[in-house]
Amino acid sequence: MSKLFNINLQLFADSGYLKDNLTGFVPTEQAAGIMKDVARGSSILRLSKVEPMKSDKKKFSIMTDGPGAYWVGETERIQTSTAQWIFPEMEAKKLGVIIPVTKEKLNDTTINVFGELRPAIAEAFYKAIDAACLFGTNSPFTKSILSVADGIDNEIVDGTAASLDLDVSDLMALIEDGGLDVNGFTAHYGIKNRLRKLRDSNGNQLFVNGVDQKEFYNNPIEFVRNGAWDKTKAELIAGNWNYSLVGIRAGIEYEILKEATLHTVTMGDGKPLALAEQDMVAIKATMRIGFLPIKDEAFAVLRPSGFVIS
């Protein structure tokens, strides 16, 4: 008898009206689309190793020094050695965005509403993710890429060498001195013109401005967009991004706010937006993401010209 009432609640929520589903998970198809846009728009996600998270914490087993091999004769006993491991733990933090909309949106379906808001939600997410993970801006995480590079003095000031390509080569050498290869760069959009002008001894461009992937020194380079990059702190970051871990928990939750005052949104009179006064509602969308750079020496930063390294 119970089988008659075996209703798919997620399907019901997806196809229902927003006014009847004031809290819940973003419909599956729209949530997948938002995450696809986030992955496409976030430089840190495109470069890093992304791990799924089934809970808010995930522990990793990382071998920092492997066991040694020994030459032995036919009658000699093989020596033993001990591998060294670390067990870093990544913790997912909640990331949220609040988007004001007219009350009429409550009469639309959840599928249509989140299909329409998909670009705005995704952009807010990937901008915040890049700013936090790269620079520690408004970040809940204990480390950022910039902080680990700065902590071991893996930094060079732009203009130290005769040209940008030589500065970047020296930057790569800092990582290579630690026995690691650079496998990618990230930088701000304003550096593109300087990169396009770089040539090798045969006149060939060092920067390849491909359609699907851009490369510098035969490694992918990602340009951080929409204000996430802090040009006062860095021109470019080099790294072995296998040592940058990002964890993502499945699902994007939402909540409809009706009476809130949004202090991050100001009206023409300079006052914060009061939803009830403006006959509006707001949609709060949240996701959970973790971040952990697991090897400090895997990253190096090119500081802007004039930057004083302390």
Which ranges hold each PLM region?
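Assembly/oligomerization interface modules of large self-assembling protein complexes
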Residues: 16-97, 298
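Alpha-helical scaffold segments that mediate packing/assembly in large oligomeric complexes
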Residues: 86-89, 97-177, 301-302, 308-310
